[in-house]
Curated annotation (Swiss-Prot):
Belongs to the lipase maturation factor family. It is linked to Defects in Lmf1 are the cause of combined lipase deficiency (cld). Cld is characterized by severe hypertriglyceridemia with accumulation of chylomicrons that gradually pack the lumina of capillaries and sinusoids. Severe hypertriglyceridemia causes an increase in blood viscosity, ischemia, and cyanosis, and the inability of tissues to access circulating triglycerides results in starvation, poor thermoregulation, and death 2 to 3 days after birth. GO terms for biological process: chylomicron remnant clearance; endoplasmic reticulum to Golgi vesicle-mediated transport; protein glycosylation; protein maturation; protein secretion; regulation of cholesterol metabolic process; regulation of triglyceride metabolic process; triglyceride metabolic process. The keyword Cell cycle does not apply. Disulfide bonds: none annotated. This is Lipase maturation factor 1. Interacts with LPL and SEL1L. Involved in the maturation of specific proteins in the endoplasmic reticulum. Required for maturation and transport of active lipoprotein lipase (LPL) through the secretory pathway. Each LMF1 molecule chaperones 50 or more molecules of LPL. GO terms for cellular component: endoplasmic reticulum membrane. It is found in: Endoplasmic reticulum membrane.
Length: 574
């Protein structure tokens, strides 16, 4: 896949345009009795969404937890004080662009609470934001309890990271999480942490906001394919996908060797799920549930077949809005104190009430808020719908600074061969010497050593590994951070080395030279000669990616970019 067309990973521009849709709040239709899927004596009604809200909030909290865990583990080395692209330097550049001001213009360009914090220790700020996010998301995940305050905090914290993360946070799933999280704010009651807040039933507007989101995600992904690479029309894209996806897993190794007819079936199934199934949302309860089941199964298959970060896990979240309490009852235990019993009591009270329940001021305010949300989402959806209908459709783009409603798409084109950048170092005084021994650095997950088994890490992901995949399609001049990484490896920088799996110079003097080599990779044939030798990959050198460099060669390069020159260990002399 080309990096500029990969939907879930395509980097967005520095100036982001941002956008979603909505629906009007309306009272639930007269509920009908349905046999509880858990086969308990209680009969849960259709048409209510108390349990749906709990499942949605827990699922969203899980994604937030993974996202903040990735941030806590990787941000310091990527955007910290001495990171590959320091966020302090980025914010200073934004400030200078707006004549040294941190006013409204700077806030709307890069909405982040970093503007309010002390920049003298950005590593502390980054860890603080990540730990707060981990703490709040853990609470919601474990308890199923949330209110608007907690969900707003999660959304604001993650948005603060995304808007200073630069290219490391330019993947499509960042905007998708922010849009999903924004809807999650209005899914919750304002103050109470009750899992079943009787005065705050789940809003139909918010539910339709989630349904509108999954509709756009899937239809956008389907349309970008049929408008993009012709292999989606001649049904051959899956012949290449498993081998050339950003970070393959072991299952992809075997799926790649599936019969040709199976790959054709996969492609046709993809078109069915992405182009036709989304319209099931508008065909009543049964078809909506069928839509939810098909979309979740589709995402599970994608999760099994590749390390696509938490993208597919995240896409499951809005699909949950297709199910009501009767459909999700099987997820909850039965019992006199169980949630199903409590929901049944609420349903009975509603059905037995002769007069409509009087609404207090809080309920009326909440209804106004929900209607306002629907109007906002509908308004922001206008350019998104225009984009969907356009023959020049773009994906993973936002039309507003808060990324409330966005465009989506995936794999608009598929690359037909896999290339990788391999970083190598040597302690030889002369990089051109025939006897110079070059040793490979190994990344956490991206292909490198042909004998190393592909990793299995979804929903976790390594941002550096993903960017290395993009770098292989471009030049090092287009990816200045890769030379920053090379400089840090030359100095034996511990933060940079923590981003890698294997440092060939561990316990030794750092290398004198670093170079980048460009290789073509192919899966070995299961049962073939290379596979029997233990190789998962066959690789062939294409040529140099960047020439051999010493730390002193990078001094001017670092100076012009205001990067501090890494200091080699005192025991190391050159």
């Amino acid at each position: 896949m080309r990096p500029d067309s990969l939907v879930m990973a395509a980097p967005e521009g520095s100036l982001r345009k941002r956008k979603v849709g909505g629906a009007e709040h309306s009272p639930a239709s007269q509920p009908s009795l349905a046999r509880d899927p858990a086969d308990s004596p209680a009969r849960l009604h259709t048409g209510t969404f108390w349990l749906t809200r709990i499942v949605l909030l827990r699922a969203l909290a899980f994604i937030y937890f993974v996202a903040f865990l990735v941030a806590f583990n990787q941000n310091k080395a990527l955007i910290g004080d001495r990171g590959l692209l320091p966020c302090k330097l980025y914010l200073k550049n934004v400030q200078e662009y707006f004549q040294g001001s941190t006013g409204w213009a700077a806030w709307t360009y890069a909405p982040t609470i970093m503007w309010l914090l002390d920049w003298s220790d950005m590593n502390f700020n980054l860890d603080l934001i990540a730990l707060l996010g981990l703490g709040i998301s853990s609470f919601v995940l474990v308890t199923g309890c949330a209110n608007m305050i907690l969900m707003t905090a999660l959304w604001a914290l993650y948005m603060s990271l995304v808007n200073v993360g630069q290219i490391w946070y330019s993947f499509g799933w960042e905007s998708q999480l922010l849009e999903t999280g924004f809807l999650g704010i209005f899914l919750s009651p304002l103050w109470t942490l009750s899992r079943l807040p009787k005065n705050t039933p789940t809003s139909q507007i918010v539910l339709w906001g989630f349904r509108w989101l999954i509709f756009r995600i899937m239809l956008g992904a389907g349309l970008i394919k049929v408008r993009g690479d012709k292999c989606w029309l001649d049904l051959t894209c899956m012949d290449f996908h498993y081998e050339t996806q950003p970070v393959p897993n072991p299952i992809a190794y075997y799926l790649h060797r599936s019969p040709w007819w199976f790959h054709r079936f996969e492609t046709l199934s993809n078109h069915f799920v992405e182009l036709l199934v989304p319209f099931f949302l508008f065909l009543g309860r049964r078809m909506r549930i069928l839509h939810g089941v098909l979309q979740i199964l589709f995402q599970v298959i994608l999760i099994i077949s590749g390390n696509l970060s938490f993208l597919n896990w995240l896409t499951i979240v809005p699909s949950l809005a297709c199910f009501d309490d009767a459909a999700l009852g099987f997820l909850f235990p039965s019992g006199p104190q169980g949630l199903k019993k409590q929901v049944l009591e609420i349903q009975r009270e509603d059905t037995q009430r002769v007069q409509p329940k009087p609404r207090d001021r809080g309920c009326l305010v909440r209804q106004v808020v929900n209607i306002s949300l629907g109007i906002l989402v509908a308004w922001l959806s206008v350019p998104v719908v225009i984009n969907l209908l356009s023959s020049r459709q773009i994906m993973n783009t936002s039309f507003n600074p808060l990324r409330i409603v966005n465009t989506y798409g995936a794999f608009g084109s598929v690359t037909k061969e896999r290339t990788e950048v391999i970083l190598q170092g040597t302690v030889s005084p002369n990089a051109s010497a025939p006897d110079a021994v070059w040793e490979d650095y190994e990344f956490k997950c991206k292909p490198g050593d042909p004998w190393r088994q592909p990793c299995l890490i979804s929903p976790y992901h390594y941002r550096l590994d993903w960017l290395m995949w993009f770098a292989a399609f471009q030049t090092y001049e287009q990816n200045e951070w890769i030379l920053h990484l090379a400089g840090k490896l030359l100095a034996g920088d511990s933060e940079a080395l923590a981003l890698l799996a294997v440092n060939p110079f561990e316990g030794r003097t750092p290398p004198r030279w670093i170079r980048g080599e460009h290789y073509r990779y192919k899966f070995s044939l299961p049962g073939g000669q290379h596979a029997t030798q233990g190789k998962w990959w066959i690789r062939k050198r294409i040529g140099p990616y960047f020439p051999p460099l010493r730390l002193e060669d990078l001094k001017e390069y670092f100076k012009t970019r205001e990067w501090p020159l890494p200091e080699p260990p005192s025991r190391h002399t050159r």
